[in-house]
């Protein structure tokens, strides 16, 4: 049996190659930053303890007046968002240009060249034509419900809401995140509002799992894809 002994330099090169391969494999999945950066929930401030008045009704315990509806208006209140997004977009463009040119002139000859090039002339013709068309269309539909929490109350009374829903299905973890600004006047009696009535709405649907990792190209692969000439 023939034995092969690696020189120190060859050993170092082999170790570097293994390290680069492991680094490239580890970079196959690049985490994506969520579009919603604000907190997903909020808790109301702890109310100050009040001395019991001795009656049946305790305003400090109830948290809201007796004859007030249950619509959210304070930090920590919850609200149901009815997601009903349907967006269609179509775009088309075209361009057409045509340019032609023709040049014809005689070349004067003198002396002994007259016999050879007596009828010599030059002509040039050019034609440039360009035609292009393009089109794109997109259709997105997103329906569902998510319950969010009031994280802030603006000075004008509008509510800043955000929330997250996580679902573990088989071996994949799916996320639904929502944030926006809600006008309390648009909230129905069922304590819900449509997403189309929410200002600055940010809706995110993503997943984590082996299927999502298989569909994501690593940054090192994207680098070689951009510089490859084929």
Curated annotation (Swiss-Prot):
PROSITE patterns per record: PROKAR_LIPOPROTEIN
Subcellular location, record wording: Cell outer membrane; Bacterial flagellum basal body
One GO-annotated biological process of the protein: bacterial-type flagellum-dependent cell motility
Membrane topology according to the record: Lipid-anchor
One protein family per Pfam: FlgH
Signal peptide residues on this chain, from the entry's feature table: 1-26
Keyword set, alphabetical order: Bacterial flagellum, Cell outer membrane, Lipoprotein, Membrane, Palmitate, Signal
Lipidated positions per record (N-palmitoyl cysteine): 27
GO cellular component term, pick one: bacterial-type flagellum basal body, distal rod, L ring
Assigned protein family: Belongs to the FlgH family.
Summary of the function given for this chain in its UniProt record: Assembles around the rod to form the L-ring and probably protects the motor/basal body from shearing forces during rotation.
Subunit structure: The basal body constitutes a major portion of the flagellar organelle and consists of four rings (L,P,S, and M) mounted on a central rod.
HAMAP family assigned to the protein according to its UniProt record, in alphabetical order: FlgH
Protein name as catalogued: Flagellar L-ring protein
Species this chain originates from: Burkholderia lata (strain ATCC 17760 / DSM 23089 / LMG 22485 / NCIMB 9086 / R18194 / 383)
Gene from which the chain derives: flgH
């Amino acid at each position: 049996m023939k034995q092969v002994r690696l020189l120190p330099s060859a050993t170092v090169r082999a170790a570097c190659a293994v390290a680069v391969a492991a680094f490239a494999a580890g970079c196959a999945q690049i985490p994506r930053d969520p579009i919603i950066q604000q907190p997903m929930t909020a808790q109301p401030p702890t109310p100050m303890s009040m001395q019991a008045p001795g009656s049946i009704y305790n305003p400090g315990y109830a948290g809201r007046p007796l004859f007030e509806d249950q619509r959210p208006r304070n930090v920590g209140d919850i609200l149901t968002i009815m997601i009903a997004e349907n967006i269609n977009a179509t775009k088309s463009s075209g361009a057409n240009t045509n340019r032609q040119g023709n040049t014809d002139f005689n070349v004067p000859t003198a002396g002994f060249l007259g016999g050879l090039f007596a009828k010599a002339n030059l002509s040039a013709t050019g034609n440039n034509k360009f035609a292009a068309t393009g089109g794109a269309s997109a259709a997105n539909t997103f329906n569902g419900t998510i319950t969010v929490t009031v994280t802030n109350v603006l000075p004008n009374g509008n509510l800043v809401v955000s929330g997250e829903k996580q679902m573990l299905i088989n071996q994949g973890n799916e996320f639904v995140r929502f944030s926006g600004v809600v006008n309390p006047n648009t909230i129905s009696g069922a304590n819900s509002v449509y997403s189309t009535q929410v200002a600055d709405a940010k809706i995110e649907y993503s997943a984590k799992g082996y299927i999502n990792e298989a569909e994501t190209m690593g940054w090192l692969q994207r680098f070689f894809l951009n510089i490859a000439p084929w």
